[in-house]
Swiss-Prot record:
SUPFAM superfamilies: YbeD/HP0495-like. Pfam families: DUF493. Belongs to the UPF0250 family. PANTHER family: UPF0250 PROTEIN YBED (PTHR38036:SF1). It comes from the Bacteria. It comes from Vibrio vulnificus (strain YJ016). HAMAP family: UPF0250. Gene3D superfamilies: 3.30.70.260. GO terms for cellular component: cytosol. This is UPF0250 protein VV0902. The lineage of its organism: Bacteria, Pseudomonadati, Pseudomonadota, Gammaproteobacteria, Vibrionales.
Length: 92
């Protein structure tokens, strides 16, 4: 079982390069996966197949995408830029 110290930083928990999954939640718009992929491709070019799941009421979609992260700066930049997409509500 992994126990994480509350003072531990994400960069101290990861060894790069590593597999890293982003879960982006936003309004149920058909362009959501495209906008997420556009940001991902800018910082981690590759061939991705994001998984899209609707919420129970269908108002929101979650887009999960796994990348090979090369640095903590890349991870943080992607969190920031994914969160700035106009139809995104949350990035995990």
């Amino acid at each position: 079982m992994l126990t994480i110290n509350s003072d531990a930083k994400l960069k101290d928990l990861l060894e790069f390069p590593c597999s890293f999954t982003y879960k982006v939640m936003g309004y149920a718009k058909p362009e959501l996966p495209e906008k997420v992929l556009e940001v991902i491709q800018r910082h981690a070019p590759g061939d991705y197949s994001p998984a899209v799941k609707p919420s129970a009421k269908g108002n929101y979609h979650s887009v999960s995408i796994n990348i090979t992260a090369t640095s903590i700066e890349q991870v943080e930049t992607l969190y920031k830029e994914l969160g700035e997409i106009d139809i995104v509500r949350m990035v995990l």
